[in-house]
Amino acid sequence: MIQKEKIESLFDKWTMKLRLIPDWDITLQWIEDPSWNKTGDIKIDCTDKKAIVLLNAVSPKQENLEEVLVHELMHLKLYPLDQVTEALIQSNFEEGSNGYKLAYHGFFETLEQTVEELTKCFLLEFGENKNLSFGRCGTQKTFTELYDGLNNLE
């Protein structure tokens, strides 16, 4: 059972800890739709400096919602870098080209890894629940399965 009051208290703590407040107006929204397949997400309006953190109240895939909360807030913290890099990719590559696809995929994968690493660092230092979620990892192929069927290079 999700303890919404506890998560809302952690939301207040983390918006201050990450120095997002008072620069940004940020709210937390619980998603009650069982068909929503994410654990968390964020909507950002840079013009008005407003953001909405969305958390799955029905069927979250991650065990530690504090980790998810910090992860989504890190996306807001890094959003200026996200926007500049995306603009550079769009201005230097033709949309749909191989270079565009490579740059876009590489950037967003690296951004996601960076957000997650920063989340882990802050969570392990300042989090109330320092246990990392392994929900998505459990659905991935094993190392052996990834290489099963590849030809021997010798």
Regions found by a protein language model. Name each.
Residues 2-63, 80-154:
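Metalloprotease/metallohydrolase-associated module, dominated by Zn2+-dependent proteases
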